[in-house]
Design a protein with these regions (language model features):
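Transmembrane helix segments
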Residues: 32-42, 195-230
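Aromatic- and glycine-rich beta-strand/loop motifs that create alpha-glucan
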Residues: 1-27
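Junction motif at the cytosolic side of a transmembrane helix
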Residues: 190, 194, 257-280
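Alpha-helix N-cap/helix-start motif at helix boundaries, enriched for small hydrophobics
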Residues: 112-116, 273
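Transmembrane helix boundary and interhelical loop/hinge segments in multi-pass membrane proteins
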Residues: 85-105, 278
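Secretory targeting signals
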Residues: 27-89, 116-185, 189, 236-258
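Short hydrophobic, aromatic-rich alpha-helical segments embedded in or entering the lipid bilayer
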Residues: 223-243
Length: 280
């Protein structure tokens, strides 16, 4: 019953034109970035490496597919939550506004199963967004620029990762990025259970992300105790896979915190949805 309901919910997502906005946006944005780097990427690389050229000598294909994919992820991962929230934010409230939620509740399926199918459908859509971003960034990037060692600039200095040691890092990085975006999906669906307006949950989701991001970036002592537990703090944890040595403890911590957020949001949504008056 859950599988069939999830399939039906995903069909509803696929039937909405806005669902393809994310795929189109990723295609266009990544395409523009790839074209710009192909046309004048070495100028950008020279600007970044200018401070190291006096002490280091760079040889080989610096502007390669691995570096291009990393640049794309840096630019786009923080913007993808909006594309996810646009679709998942009205999975409950949208049907409430149209009145179709009453018809669904009349079927021989529990409210909990119905809501979980919406969470699963939202997770599948989020996964497709992440996979498409990976194809455009990594696969197309390597096709256009070729393979090569990855040069990463972080707080500790310059890290150079061998080409043979990179693919598994991208897999792990995208997995953490998916978990972070899944938290956004769970948040928007949870908020959707509290509203009959399709726009409200989407706007509130983005407002929460902006607020938490500001709290996370402000170097104020009062926020030190809560900053590590905000999900936005861990939305960039995919970068940890491109450090050497790999900060395993930090990655585990981020994964656990994101999972806890998802469990809490789903639990709150289930409680609210089971008590929600959908007869009026």
């Amino acid at each position: 019953m859950l599988f069939k309901s999830t399939y039906n919910e995903f069909i509803k997502i696929a039937a909405k034109p806005r669902s393809y906005l994310g795929l189109v946006a990723i295609t266009v944005l990544v395409g523009v970035i790839l074209f710009a780097l192909k046309a004048d990427g070495m100028s950008f690389i020279s600007f970044v490496t200018a401070s190291f050229e006096q002490t280091l000598s760079f040889e080989g294909n610096i502007l390669n597919g691995n570096l291009v994919a990393f640049i794309v992820l840096q630019m786009l991962v923080i913007h993808i939550p909006l594309l996810v929230a646009l679709v998942t934010g009205d999975l409950v409230s949208g049907e409430g506004a149209m009145g179709t939620i009453r018809m669904l509740a009349a079927k021989p399926i529990s409210r909990s199963t119905l809501l979980m199918s919406k969470f699963l459908a939202g997770a599948v859509y989020t996964l497709l967004i992440v996979i498409w971003l990976g194809i455009m960034a990594v696969v197309v990037g390597k096709w256009m620029f070729g393979p090569g060692d990855l040069m990463v600039l972080n707080s500790d200095g310059l890290v150079i990762l061998q080409d043979a040691d990179i693919n598994w890092r991208y897999v792990g990085g995208f997995a953490v990025a998916f978990l972070a975006l899944l938290t956004v999906s769970s948040l928007s669906i949870c908020l959707s259970c509290f509203s009959d307006n399709s726009i409200g949950p989407i706007v509130i989701t983005m407002a929460i992300i902006i607020l938490f991001t500001i709290i996370g970036t402000l170097d104020v002592t009062i926020f030190d105790n809560i900053r590590p537990y905000l999900f936005t703090t861990h939305m960039a944890s995919w970068r940890s896979y491109f450090e050497d040595p790999l900060p395993v403890v930090d990655i585990y911590k981020s994964v656990i915190i994101l999972l806890v957020h998802n469990v809490v949001l789903i639990t709150v949504a289930l409680v609210k949805f089971n008590k929600k008056d959908i007869t009026s």
